[in-house]
């Protein structure tokens, strides 16, 4: 690594970060098993991974696992507020190029994404590990701009303005960079619902030039990280941000997918009276039969003490909704991007910063709302994200996906796919001992009776867990 090929808040935080990484390793059996299984064969030897995913203690364990099995890695955060500065310092201190500071600007955010593709030897990355598809979008938009730079002329948002400026800057410094980089990519593995939606859209438009593995829809990711992770980290973020009593409050959760289910359970477990909004009749029926009142935000916003978005969509909480809420209503997002809440519509109102990632926005009539993490992920902005154990399952899927793409890319088409069921079951199996779980074993006769092998896979691909 070149001299100081990193950007962190304070490299002196490395020792603190290392202590927490050591603890996290004891809670991440899947990643530690990957190190043990693949340390000799080194399946990622020669892999040059550009990673864009929240720089946390748990991500540090992922990065060090990728390196332990042969990969070279450069890393940036996928959110301006999610970096844990001591984790970033600990990663940088080991010689990994890492770029992230909690509270970085949008300009810095896109500069850091650019940096994960700038290797000291000048050669390109051959894999992307993404969270929200920003790194993928950077390369693909840049390669299209090298053909037609007019696509960068009219940014629609402030973030897009910085995004386009960074592409223009790189095009000027390194002509042809994006096309060369796009051609070198074997594939991308994507962590989140939002990123997967972007990849499917690229596939639909014929703009996906390499294979993409949808890690998000591995059962051991979506049914665990999205649900059980949010169940623990949502209330943690609200409490750290506000110190407000949740019991007895009325909370509205927008969306009842896996993230919404975990969020509703988190709030109801803390004693809140939870209401759900939904567009999908199946999810709405699930919410109703789980005991929640299913409402529309138009009707129910005025009753809310807390509103949480979980949808991955845009304009879920609009300005007209925010005008209806109670004074000092807490407003936050645990979906992905900050456009679930119309934060841009609040920018011309008075903001009072209470502490990092906690602001009070005041309306002309004197009503105030407490906005967490400026509408970005509150569980990472106001707290430290999901616990290590559940992230071990998600990140073990990422490791296996990167191995698949690097060693078997020719078996994948330029489309979005999920990991095979056998690997999903493997990830689950790696986490059972830590919880003291003992599996029953099918006899040969039982296995034949239900049409499987005693070793699995035990469910068809269409099975819904």
UniProtKB/Swiss-Prot annotation:
Transmembrane segments: none
Predominant localisation class: cytoplasm
GO MF terms, alphabetically ordered: adenosylhomocysteinase activity
Keywords: Cytoplasm, Hydrolase, NAD, One-carbon metabolism
Gene3D superfamilies recorded: Adenosylhomocysteinase-like (3.40.50.1480), NAD(P)-binding Rossmann-like Domain (3.40.50.720)
Catalytic activity: S-adenosyl-L-homocysteine + H2O = L-homocysteine + adenosine
UniProt KW Hydrolase keyword: yes
Cofactor note as given: Binds 1 NAD(+) per subunit.
Recorded GO CC terms: cytosol
InterPro entries (UniProt xref): Adenosylhomocyst_ase-like_sf (IPR042172), Adenosylhomocysteinase-like (IPR000043), Ado_hCys_hydrolase_NAD-bd (IPR015878), NAD(P)-bd_dom_sf (IPR036291), S-Ado-L-homoCys_hydrolase_CS (IPR020082)
Subcellular location: Cytoplasm
One record GO biological process: L-homocysteine biosynthetic process
Task of the protein: May play a key role in the regulation of the intracellular concentration of adenosylhomocysteine.
Family to which the UniProt record says this protein belongs: Belongs to the adenosylhomocysteinase family.
Protein name: Adenosylhomocysteinase
Organism whose genome encodes this protein: Bartonella quintana (strain Toulouse)
């Amino acid at each position: 690594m070149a001299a100081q090929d990193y950007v962190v808040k304070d490299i002196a935080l490395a020792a603190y970060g290392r202590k927490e990484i050591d603890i996290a390793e004891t809670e991440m059996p899947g990643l530690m098993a990957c190190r043990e299984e693949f340390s000799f064969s080194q399946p990622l030897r020669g892999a040059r991974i550009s990673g864009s995913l929240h720089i946390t203690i748990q991500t540090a364990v992922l990065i060090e696992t990728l390196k332990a099995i042969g990969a070279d890695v450069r890393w940036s955060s996928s959110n301006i507020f999610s970096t844990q500065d001591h984790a970033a310092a600990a990663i940088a201190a080991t010689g990994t190029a890492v770029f992230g500071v909690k509270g970085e600007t949008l300009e810095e955010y896109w500069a850091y994404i650019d940096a994960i593709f700038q290797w000291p030897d000048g050669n390109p990355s051959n894999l992307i590990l993404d969270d929200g598809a920003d790194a993928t979008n950077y390369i693909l938009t840049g390669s299209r701009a090298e053909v037609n730079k007019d696509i960068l002329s009219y940014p629609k948002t402030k973030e897009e303005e910085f995004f386009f400026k960074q592409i223009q800057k790189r095009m000027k410094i390194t002509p042809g960079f994006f096309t060369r980089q796009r051609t070198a990519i074997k594939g991308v593995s994507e962590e989140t619902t939002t990123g997967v939606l972007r990849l499917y859209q690229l596939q639909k438009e014929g703009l996906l030039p390499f294979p993409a593995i949808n890690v998000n829809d591995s059962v051991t990711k979506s049914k665990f990280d999205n649900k059980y992770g949010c169940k623990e980290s949502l209330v943690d973020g609200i409490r750290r941000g506000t110190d407000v009593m949740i019991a007895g409050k009325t909370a509205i959760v927008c969306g009842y997918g896996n993230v919404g289910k975990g969020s509703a359970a988190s709030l109801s477990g803390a004693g809140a009276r939870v209401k759900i909004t939904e567009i999908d009749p199946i999810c709405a029926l699930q919410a109703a039969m789980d005991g929640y009142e299913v409402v529309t935000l138009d009707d129910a916003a005025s009753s809310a003490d807390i509103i949480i978005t979980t949808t991955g969509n845009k304009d879920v909480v609009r300005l007209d909704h925010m005008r209806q809420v109670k004074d000092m209503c807490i407003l936050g997002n645990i979906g992905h991007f900050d456009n679930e809440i119309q934060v841009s519509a609040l920018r011309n109102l008075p903001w009072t910063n209470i502490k990092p990632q906690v602001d009070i926005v005041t309306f002309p009539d004197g009503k105030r709302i407490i906005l967490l993490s400026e509408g970005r992920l509150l569980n990472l902005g106001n707290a430290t994200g999901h616990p290590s154990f559940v992230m071990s399952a998600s990140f073990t899927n990422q490791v296996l996906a990167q191995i698949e793409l690097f060693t078997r890319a020719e078996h994948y088409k330029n489309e979005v796919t999920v990991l095979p069921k056998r690997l999903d079951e493997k990830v689950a199996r790696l986490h059972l001992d830590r919880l003291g779980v003992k599996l029953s074993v099918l006899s040969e006769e039982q296995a034949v009776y239900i049409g499987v092998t005693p070793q699995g896979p035990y469910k068809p691909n269409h099975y819904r867990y």
